[in-house]
Amino acid sequence: MQPPHMLLALSDGPRALADAACLQVFSPLLRKLPKTDRKHSVMVLPGDDRGNGPLIRYLRHLGYTATGWRQGRNLGPQSFTEESLTSALEPLLDAGGGKVSLVGHSLGGIYAREIAGMRPEHIHQVITLGSPFGKGHQQASHASRLYQRLNPQPDARDDDDSLNTPPPVPTTAIYTKADGVVNWRTSLQQGDDHDVHNIEVVGSHIGLNLNAAVWFWIAKKLAEV
């Protein structure tokens, strides 16, 4: 499987700006979506930046107890330990009645799935945004070389079979066929389990966390819990 075409890769950043501009247009409508009337915590895990602030604030507007992952920049396994990441869940579990939903952008979605696999009893659901957990992901991403440079030691998380196995909780994979960073096929969850859903949106990879359609689907899926 090949990485996205170079035209998609080179245009992903500019298209992310367009995603953010469209979000401003649709923001008034998104803010009118029903607010939750239940205790429900959400942790948002980043890709490789700290651009999840607007999404977190939007989820708080809808009544969710939402936070980032509180581990700094996500540069791969060196950015955190499993203990530090799971311990960051504790205050959210207390605020959310014992469970939390996880939303992960790109690499953050892979770690969200991993957390759900380790502690499924504490996870409502997992929503991934352009996360390359599918088979062949290492060869199908323009970010692979940078990731390997930052994380030279082999990591068990890189195993195709273990990554592609869905966690034992409801899982939604949001993807875009115009993804300029990873081959969109690696962001799909295979299988026909009723707890697994793949949702296509139009947009860039970088801008998935600032995409109006993505915000709509996140709000919809969280409300279903």
PLM feature segments, named:
Residues M1-C22, G136, A140, Y147-L150, ...:
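Alpha/beta hydrolase fold serine-hydrolase catalytic domain that processes acyl esters and thioesters
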Residues G53-R57, W184-R185:
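Short, surface-exposed alpha-helical segments at coil->helix boundaries
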Residues P167-V225:
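C-terminal catalytic-base region of ester-bond hydrolases, centering on the histidine
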